[in-house]
């Protein structure tokens, strides 16, 4: 009985593969998505950006920084400097060296907002980064309140994730997939 099931399964696979060889091969098309990928796939895997760098990782910063912390965001071979300015009074700011030139004064503004969560604030936001000469993509990011003792190991960490990617489609049996 088990041998017959295995044989039928193997036969079905062989017939399917043979039939696939008879179908005309369609061209695979890639569409770059600069944002919204995490919503489409239903989640993300955060990456840690430690704020353990010296100010020398950038060449120019806004003059009004009061409590800056510097770090790198890395994805594959690429990396972008960032700074979080968290003054004792006033709102925190996030700056990202989108184009990788070391100048934090010539990049698009980031989105960075605090959300009260009990007695603590968690900051959420996003920023564009230059992937190559033609493409920019969005990174989502968040930072837990450094005063939250439950998350003490993340006290000097920016969590980030790519929200960009590629979608692939091809024609099979007259239908675009």
For the regions a protein language model found, what residue spans apply to each?
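Bacterial N-terminal signal peptides
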Residues: 9-21
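Calcium-binding acidic motifs and repeat modules
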Residues: 24-177
């Amino acid at each position: 009985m088990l041998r017959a099931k295995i044989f039928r399964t193997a036969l079905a696979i062989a017939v399917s593969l043979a039939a696939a060889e008879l179908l005309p091969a369609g061209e695979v098309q890639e569409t770059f998505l600069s944002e919204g990928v995490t919503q489409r796939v239903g989640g993300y895997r955060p990456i840690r950006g430690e704020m353990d760098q010296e100010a020398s990782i950038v060449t120019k910063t806004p003059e009004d920084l009061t409590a800056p912390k510097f770090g790198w965001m890395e994805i594959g071979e690429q990396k972008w400097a960032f700074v979080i300015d968290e003054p004792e009074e006033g709102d925190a700011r996030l700056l990202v060296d989108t184009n990788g030139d070391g100048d934090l004064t010539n990049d698009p503004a980031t989105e960075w907002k605090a959300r009260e969560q009990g007695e603590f604030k968690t900051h959420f936001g996003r920023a564009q980064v230059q992937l190559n000469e033609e493409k920019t993509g969005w990174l989502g990011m968040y930072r837990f309140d450094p005063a939250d003792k439950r998350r003490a190991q993340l006290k000097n960490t920016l969590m980030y994730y790519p929200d960009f990617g590629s979608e692939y489609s091809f024609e099979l049996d007259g239908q675009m997939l």
